[in-house]
Amino acid sequence: MASQHDKKSVQSGLLHPRNPHRGRYDLDALCRTCPELKMHIQIKPTGDKTIDFSDAKAVLCLNRALLAHYYQVSNWQIPEGYLCPPIPGRADYIHYLADLLAEDLPTSAKGKKIRVLDIGTGANCIYPIIGSQSYGWHFVGTDIDPLAIKIAGMIVQANSCLNGKITLKQQLDKKLIFKGIINEDKFDLTMCNPPFHASLAEAEAGNQRKRKNLGHGKENRAQEKLNFGGQNAELWCPGGEIVFLRQMAEESVAFAKQVRWFSSLLSKGKNVAPLKKLLKQLGCKRIKVVEMAQGQKISRFIAWSFSQE
């Protein structure tokens, strides 16, 4: 069978239909769930309620409220300097992966038998939280940062609803991605939010642009792109995402029979074609590019499989 190359279009500005974060935030409901959010509420000239998305403490508090309200995770805290992820956009990746898996397993794409590997889980542990609470999947989260693994582990331990659903594992060799992690294991999915930037300077410039946009009042669902924190490994690597994902693709060959679908977010559209070309050369049977909309921003992930089913 020839390799399949799918590019799914999305309705402009709309999150996945199953994403509970579609539409405006219900800040009143979130404040009832997390009363501390009240101190960060501001009133716009229109009379609508909002928060200051350039205020790291306000964004962190909003995340705690969202996780408690929608995912029953009431104990979530990350130290200053680590990524404070945009919950709605992160949830979209999970829901579109669920669609991808359901194409292969229409009657059994939920539950603890589904095993997902999250590369670069980070201290926030956000993908395992959303995936396990939304679909009951079992996650293995990895990171090269021992402190990130420790903090994520504390989050899992502090929330009984996550116990037994999330396993955390440090990647001891910073030069490797799958090797030393998958070993003899098997997974239905792998996922990754890779370091997008090629240098620290590029990462800092990106954050400055986000701050500038907020300063000009561009407040919409795209404001959730804010990631003003971040350790070096979370934000950049030599060569940027294309180098990282080429290595990921090449390493995936060794685990072709152990993983149903490999996947990763892909921030730069220009990187799609060279990655698809490489994946074809590596023998992938199925390659898909799935677009996701968050406000005015279109993001995407690339997924590949060495099986034809």
Curated annotation (Swiss-Prot):
InterPro entries: METTL16/RlmF, rRNA_lsu_MeTfrase_F, SAM-dependent_MTases_sf
Location(s) in or outside the cell: Cytoplasm
UniProt GO cellular component terms: cytoplasm
Coiled-coil features, chain-numbered ranges: none
Claim: rRNA processing is one of the keywords in the record: yes
Cytoplasm listed as a keyword: yes
Pfam families in alphabetical order: Methyltransf_10
Purpose: Specifically methylates the adenine in position 1618 of 23S rRNA.
Family that this chain belongs to: Belongs to the methyltransferase superfamily. METTL16/RlmF family.
Protein name: Ribosomal RNA large subunit methyltransferase F
